[in-house]
Amino acid sequence: MPPLSIVDPHIHLFNLSQGEYQWLSPNTSPLWPDKSIISHDFCQQDLLLAEPLSLSGFVHIEAGFDNARPWREIQWLEQHCFLPFRSVAGIDLTLSTALFRKHLERLTSYSSVVGIRHVLGNLSEQLCSHPKVISNLRVVNQYALIVELQLALGDMTNIDRLIELISTNTEIDFIIEHGGLPPLEQYSTQWQCWQTNLTSLAQCRNVAIKCSGWEMLNRSYQDDWIKHIISYCIHLFSSTRVMLASNFPLLLFSMQYQDYWQRIISQVDIIDQQALLHDNAILWYKIA
Protein backbone atom coordinates (compact mmCIF):
# COMPACT_ATOMS: atom_id res chain seq x y z
CA MET A 1 0.00 0.00 0.00
CA PRO A 2 1.45 3.43 -0.94
CA PRO A 3 1.61 6.24 1.66
CA LEU A 4 -1.81 7.73 2.31
CA SER A 5 -2.74 10.80 4.34
CA ILE A 6 -6.18 10.65 5.95
CA VAL A 7 -8.45 13.43 7.16
CA ASP A 8 -11.01 11.79 9.43
CA PRO A 9 -14.29 13.76 9.22
CA HIS A 10 -16.12 12.13 12.12
CA ILE A 11 -14.49 11.50 15.50
CA HIS A 12 -15.36 12.08 19.16
CA LEU A 13 -12.98 12.81 22.02
CA PHE A 14 -13.96 12.43 25.68
CA ASN A 15 -12.86 14.15 28.88
CA LEU A 16 -14.92 12.39 31.53
CA SER A 17 -13.60 14.49 34.43
CA GLN A 18 -14.77 17.78 32.91
CA GLY A 19 -17.69 16.76 30.68
CA GLU A 20 -21.07 15.21 31.43
CA TYR A 21 -21.53 12.56 28.70
CA GLN A 22 -24.83 11.32 30.12
CA TRP A 23 -25.23 8.89 27.21
CA LEU A 24 -22.11 7.01 28.35
CA SER A 25 -23.79 5.97 31.60
CA PRO A 26 -24.49 2.20 31.57
CA ASN A 27 -28.17 2.82 32.42
CA THR A 28 -28.76 5.44 29.73
CA SER A 29 -29.74 4.87 26.10
CA PRO A 30 -28.21 3.45 24.01
CA LEU A 31 -28.20 0.39 26.27
CA TRP A 32 -25.15 -1.33 24.80
CA PRO A 33 -23.81 -4.15 27.02
CA ASP A 34 -20.26 -3.38 25.84
CA LYS A 35 -20.45 0.38 26.46
CA SER A 36 -17.57 0.13 28.94
CA ILE A 37 -15.21 -0.22 25.94
CA ILE A 38 -15.67 3.47 25.16
CA SER A 39 -16.38 4.84 28.65
CA HIS A 40 -12.90 6.30 28.99
CA ASP A 41 -11.00 9.48 28.25
CA PHE A 42 -9.92 9.79 24.63
CA CYS A 43 -7.61 12.48 23.29
CA GLN A 44 -6.10 13.28 19.91
CA GLN A 45 -3.03 11.18 20.70
CA ASP A 46 -5.23 8.08 20.73
CA LEU A 47 -5.84 8.45 16.98
CA LEU A 48 -2.90 6.20 16.20
CA LEU A 49 -1.91 5.35 12.64
CA ALA A 50 1.26 3.64 11.46
CA GLU A 51 2.91 3.82 8.05
CA PRO A 52 1.94 3.82 5.29
CA LEU A 53 -1.07 5.63 6.79
CA SER A 54 -0.98 8.99 8.53
CA LEU A 55 -3.57 11.33 10.01
CA SER A 56 -3.28 14.92 8.80
CA GLY A 57 -6.49 16.32 10.30
CA PHE A 58 -9.93 15.53 11.64
CA VAL A 59 -13.42 16.82 12.36
CA HIS A 60 -14.69 16.55 15.92
CA ILE A 61 -18.42 15.97 16.30
CA GLU A 62 -20.09 17.01 19.55
CA ALA A 63 -20.23 14.20 22.07
CA GLY A 64 -22.51 15.44 24.85
CA PHE A 65 -19.78 17.19 26.86
CA ASP A 66 -22.25 19.82 28.11
CA ASN A 67 -25.51 20.14 26.19
CA ALA A 68 -26.54 23.29 28.04
CA ARG A 69 -23.18 25.02 27.48
CA PRO A 70 -21.76 23.40 24.32
CA TRP A 71 -18.94 25.95 24.01
CA ARG A 72 -17.22 24.25 26.95
CA GLU A 73 -16.45 21.28 24.71
CA ILE A 74 -15.05 23.54 21.97
CA GLN A 75 -12.89 25.38 24.47
CA TRP A 76 -11.41 22.10 25.74
CA LEU A 77 -10.73 20.88 22.20
CA GLU A 78 -8.98 24.06 21.12
CA GLN A 79 -6.78 23.92 24.20
CA HIS A 80 -5.67 20.32 23.68
CA CYS A 81 -5.69 19.48 19.94
CA PHE A 82 -2.69 20.36 17.80
CA LEU A 83 -3.45 18.73 14.44
CA PRO A 84 -5.49 20.78 11.94
CA PHE A 85 -9.13 20.20 12.90
CA ARG A 86 -12.63 21.59 12.75
CA SER A 87 -15.48 21.09 15.19
CA VAL A 88 -19.21 20.57 14.91
CA ALA A 89 -20.85 21.90 18.06
CA GLY A 90 -23.96 20.67 19.77
CA ILE A 91 -26.97 22.98 19.93
CA ASP A 92 -30.68 22.60 20.61
CA LEU A 93 -32.55 23.53 17.45
CA THR A 94 -35.78 23.96 19.44
CA LEU A 95 -34.47 26.86 21.56
CA SER A 96 -36.15 30.23 21.32
CA THR A 97 -34.67 32.13 18.39
CA ALA A 98 -33.14 34.77 20.68
CA LEU A 99 -31.38 32.17 22.85
CA PHE A 100 -30.42 30.10 19.82
CA ARG A 101 -28.78 33.13 18.20
CA LYS A 102 -26.95 33.89 21.45
CA HIS A 103 -25.59 30.33 21.62
CA LEU A 104 -24.63 30.42 17.95
CA GLU A 105 -22.76 33.71 18.33
CA ARG A 106 -20.78 32.30 21.23
CA LEU A 107 -19.98 29.06 19.42
CA THR A 108 -18.84 30.76 16.23
CA SER A 109 -16.42 32.92 18.21
CA TYR A 110 -14.23 29.79 18.34
CA SER A 111 -12.03 29.37 15.28
CA SER A 112 -12.58 25.62 14.90
CA VAL A 113 -16.39 25.73 14.72
CA VAL A 114 -17.75 25.18 11.20
CA GLY A 115 -21.05 23.50 11.97
CA ILE A 116 -23.72 22.37 14.40
CA ARG A 117 -25.59 19.21 15.32
CA HIS A 118 -28.90 18.99 17.16
CA VAL A 119 -28.05 17.70 20.63
CA LEU A 120 -31.21 15.69 21.20
CA GLY A 121 -30.69 12.98 18.62
CA ASN A 122 -32.07 12.37 15.17
CA LEU A 123 -33.56 15.21 13.15
CA SER A 124 -36.90 13.45 12.93
CA GLU A 125 -39.86 14.09 10.65
CA GLN A 126 -41.59 15.84 13.57
CA LEU A 127 -38.65 18.15 14.22
CA CYS A 128 -38.52 19.16 10.56
CA SER A 129 -41.97 20.73 11.03
CA HIS A 130 -41.18 22.34 14.40
CA PRO A 131 -41.61 26.15 14.13
CA LYS A 132 -38.49 26.83 16.21
CA VAL A 133 -36.38 24.48 14.09
CA ILE A 134 -37.57 26.19 10.92
CA SER A 135 -36.82 29.70 12.23
CA ASN A 136 -33.49 28.71 13.77
CA LEU A 137 -32.27 27.13 10.55
CA ARG A 138 -32.88 30.50 8.89
CA VAL A 139 -30.44 31.93 11.44
CA VAL A 140 -27.90 29.21 10.66
CA ASN A 141 -28.33 30.03 6.97
CA GLN A 142 -27.11 33.57 7.71
CA TYR A 143 -23.92 32.12 9.21
CA ALA A 144 -23.35 29.73 6.27
CA LEU A 145 -22.58 26.85 8.64
CA ILE A 146 -22.74 23.09 8.24
CA VAL A 147 -25.69 21.23 9.74
CA GLU A 148 -25.00 17.57 10.51
CA LEU A 149 -27.94 15.25 9.95
CA GLN A 150 -28.45 12.14 12.06
CA LEU A 151 -31.05 10.31 10.01
CA ALA A 152 -32.33 6.75 10.12
CA LEU A 153 -33.49 7.01 6.52
CA GLY A 154 -34.92 3.51 6.46
CA ASP A 155 -37.46 4.54 9.12
CA MET A 156 -38.51 7.88 7.60
CA THR A 157 -41.65 7.50 5.51
CA ASN A 158 -41.85 11.14 4.44
CA ILE A 159 -38.84 13.42 3.99
CA ASP A 160 -40.63 16.12 1.99
CA ARG A 161 -40.35 18.62 4.85
CA LEU A 162 -36.65 17.86 5.25
CA ILE A 163 -36.09 18.37 1.53
CA GLU A 164 -37.93 21.69 1.78
CA LEU A 165 -35.74 22.82 4.68
CA ILE A 166 -32.61 21.90 2.76
CA SER A 167 -33.79 23.57 -0.44
CA THR A 168 -34.75 26.84 1.28
CA ASN A 169 -31.50 27.16 3.25
CA THR A 170 -29.01 27.15 0.41
CA GLU A 171 -26.18 28.75 2.42
CA ILE A 172 -26.12 25.72 4.71
CA ASP A 173 -24.18 22.60 3.80
CA PHE A 174 -26.10 19.61 5.15
CA ILE A 175 -23.99 16.52 5.82
CA ILE A 176 -25.64 13.15 6.41
CA GLU A 177 -23.89 11.13 9.09
CA HIS A 178 -23.20 7.39 9.02
CA GLY A 179 -24.63 6.87 5.56
CA GLY A 180 -28.12 7.60 6.84
CA LEU A 181 -27.89 4.44 9.00
CA PRO A 182 -28.58 1.84 6.31
CA PRO A 183 -30.64 -1.20 7.35
CA LEU A 184 -28.85 -4.51 7.76
CA GLU A 185 -31.39 -6.43 5.70
CA GLN A 186 -30.76 -5.65 2.05
CA TYR A 187 -33.86 -5.56 -0.15
CA SER A 188 -36.17 -5.29 2.87
CA THR A 189 -38.88 -2.62 3.03
CA GLN A 190 -36.60 -0.50 5.22
CA TRP A 191 -33.75 -0.92 2.74
CA GLN A 192 -35.96 0.26 -0.11
CA CYS A 193 -37.04 3.24 1.98
CA TRP A 194 -33.39 4.06 2.73
CA GLN A 195 -32.55 3.94 -0.98
CA THR A 196 -35.52 6.10 -1.97
CA ASN A 197 -34.82 8.75 0.66
CA LEU A 198 -31.11 8.81 -0.07
CA THR A 199 -31.83 9.25 -3.78
CA SER A 200 -34.05 12.26 -3.02
CA LEU A 201 -31.45 13.86 -0.75
CA ALA A 202 -28.71 13.36 -3.32
CA GLN A 203 -30.60 15.68 -5.68
CA CYS A 204 -29.84 18.58 -3.33
CA ARG A 205 -26.45 19.99 -4.25
CA ASN A 206 -25.82 21.32 -0.73
CA VAL A 207 -25.95 17.80 0.74
CA ALA A 208 -22.96 15.50 1.26
CA ILE A 209 -22.70 12.16 3.07
CA LYS A 210 -20.25 10.46 5.42
CA CYS A 211 -19.95 6.67 5.51
CA SER A 212 -19.11 5.38 8.99
CA GLY A 213 -20.81 4.11 12.13
CA TRP A 214 -21.07 0.54 10.87
CA GLU A 215 -20.37 -0.83 14.34
CA MET A 216 -23.48 0.87 15.76
CA LEU A 217 -25.62 -1.32 13.52
CA ASN A 218 -23.62 -4.55 13.64
CA ARG A 219 -20.48 -5.17 15.69
CA SER A 220 -19.48 -7.89 13.19
CA TYR A 221 -20.27 -6.06 9.95
CA GLN A 222 -19.11 -7.65 6.72
CA ASP A 223 -16.99 -6.20 3.92
CA ASP A 224 -19.56 -6.82 1.20
CA TRP A 225 -22.18 -4.84 3.15
CA ILE A 226 -20.03 -1.74 3.63
CA LYS A 227 -18.65 -1.95 0.08
CA HIS A 228 -22.20 -2.01 -1.28
CA ILE A 229 -23.21 1.02 0.78
CA ILE A 230 -20.11 3.05 -0.12
CA SER A 231 -20.55 2.22 -3.80
CA TYR A 232 -24.23 3.17 -3.70
CA CYS A 233 -23.44 6.50 -2.04
CA ILE A 234 -20.81 7.28 -4.69
CA HIS A 235 -23.32 6.34 -7.38
CA LEU A 236 -25.87 8.83 -6.00
CA PHE A 237 -23.66 11.66 -4.77
CA SER A 238 -20.57 11.21 -6.99
CA SER A 239 -17.10 10.92 -5.50
CA THR A 240 -17.04 14.66 -4.67
CA ARG A 241 -19.80 14.49 -2.03
CA VAL A 242 -18.87 11.30 -0.19
CA MET A 243 -16.47 11.07 2.76
CA LEU A 244 -15.22 8.05 4.67
CA ALA A 245 -14.94 8.43 8.43
CA SER A 246 -14.18 6.34 11.51
CA ASN A 247 -16.66 7.33 14.25
CA PHE A 248 -13.80 6.96 16.75
CA PRO A 249 -13.93 5.76 19.50
CA LEU A 250 -17.12 3.81 18.77
CA LEU A 251 -15.28 1.84 16.10
CA LEU A 252 -13.44 0.18 18.99
CA PHE A 253 -16.53 -1.97 19.48
CA SER A 254 -15.30 -3.84 16.40
CA MET A 255 -11.60 -3.12 15.81
CA GLN A 256 -8.64 -0.79 16.31
CA TYR A 257 -8.17 2.49 14.46
CA GLN A 258 -5.37 1.26 12.17
CA ASP A 259 -7.23 -1.93 11.32
CA TYR A 260 -10.37 0.02 10.52
CA TRP A 261 -8.71 2.29 7.98
CA GLN A 262 -6.89 -0.56 6.30
CA ARG A 263 -10.18 -2.40 5.97
CA ILE A 264 -12.07 0.63 4.62
CA ILE A 265 -9.36 1.49 2.11
CA SER A 266 -9.54 -2.03 0.70
CA GLN A 267 -13.21 -1.42 -0.19
CA VAL A 268 -12.54 1.70 -2.28
CA ASP A 269 -11.20 1.95 -5.82
CA ILE A 270 -7.76 3.54 -5.82
CA ILE A 271 -8.98 6.29 -8.16
CA ASP A 272 -11.42 7.49 -5.45
CA GLN A 273 -9.23 7.11 -2.36
CA GLN A 274 -7.67 10.59 -2.35
CA ALA A 275 -11.07 12.28 -2.57
CA LEU A 276 -12.95 10.06 -0.12
CA LEU A 277 -10.21 9.81 2.49
CA HIS A 278 -8.71 13.29 2.34
CA ASP A 279 -9.72 15.96 -0.16
CA ASN A 280 -13.48 16.02 0.34
CA ALA A 281 -13.20 16.46 4.11
CA ILE A 282 -10.87 19.43 3.61
CA LEU A 283 -13.27 20.96 1.09
CA TRP A 284 -16.54 20.48 2.96
CA TYR A 285 -15.23 21.28 6.45
CA LYS A 286 -12.81 24.03 5.38
CA ILE A 287 -9.83 22.49 7.14
CA ALA A 288 -6.72 24.65 6.79
Indicate residue ranges for each PLM-predicted region.
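Hydrophobic faces of well-ordered beta-strands that scaffold small-molecule active sites
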Residues: 7-11, 57-61, 85-89, 114-118, ...
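Alpha-helical scaffolding within the catalytic cores
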Residues: 38-47, 72-73, 99-103, 159-162, ...
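Active-site gating/metal-coordination segments in enzymes
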Residues: 71-157, 208-215
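Catalytic pocket-lining loop regions of alpha/beta-barrel enzymes
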Residues: 129-243
